[in-house]
A protein has these predicted regions:
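Internal catalytic-core helix/loop-beta-alpha segment
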Residues: 87-145
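Alpha-helix termini
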Residues: 16, 123-127, 153-161
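A short glycine-rich beta-strand->turn/loop micro-motif centered on a GG-aromatic cluster
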Residues: 133-140, 157-171
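Active-site acidic carboxylates
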Residues: 1-104
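Histidine-anchored nucleotide/phosphate-binding helix
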Residues: 50-58, 144-157
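A general structural motif
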Residues: 20-22, 60, 127-132, 161
Length: 171
């Protein structure tokens, strides 16, 4: 088993928002269907809301919300119960974060990276940002898939000036 060195851990100390460089903040799936109601909601997710709100306020930077939004019949419902159907309250950003919605991308899978709007963002705007901050839910599926695919893309395209940041209190 690989061991993480002390030097490695020291390189990943907490950052303040003032240390962010040209950031974009992604808020993934902080929507009614995961936070407050629906087949896949978990009330504990709401604990991250105040931290996400503070990050957005303190950073005063570009914020992009990602919302799980499915047509009534979608392949994902073969694996998960029906949730976050387009046009329902479940697919809407939670009220607490509504004032911060600058841009909204809707996705029909667990992975933001595959979302057509995000693919456009990659080619048209990614180079405008240095720090990509990922917040939201759920860490074992949506956040993990997004971060891993984005990191692989950054590696493949040798984007050495960009970094992915996932604040622990915001997931």
């Amino acid at each position: 088993m690989a061991r993480v060195s002390k030097q490695f851990l020291e390189a990943y100390k907490p950052l303040s928002t003032k240390e962010l460089k040209d950031p974009v903040i992604f808020v993934v799936d902080m929507i009614e269907g995961f936070v407050h109601e629906g087949a896949l909601h978990d009330e504990e997710i709401n604990a991250a809301t105040v931290h996400i709100e503070a990050l957005i306020r303190d950073a005063e930077q570009r914020v992009i919300f990602i919302a799980d939004s499915h047509p009534p019949k979608t392949r994902e419902f073969n694996s998960y119960p029906s949730h976050c159907v387009i046009g329902t309250k479940e697919s809407e950003v939670i009220q607490e974060l509504q004032p911060y919605v600058q841009e909204l991308m809707r996705k029909n899978s667990t992975n933001t990276f595959t979302c057509p709007d995000f693919q456009s963002f990659l080619t048209e705007r990614m180079d405008s940002y240095r720090d990509i901050v990922i917040t939201g839910c759920c860490t074992d599926i949506c956040i993990l898939q997004f971060a891993l695919c984005l990191n692989a893309w950054l590696n493949e395209h040798n984007k050495t000036d960009q970094r992915i940041i996932i604040p622990l209190s915001c997931v």
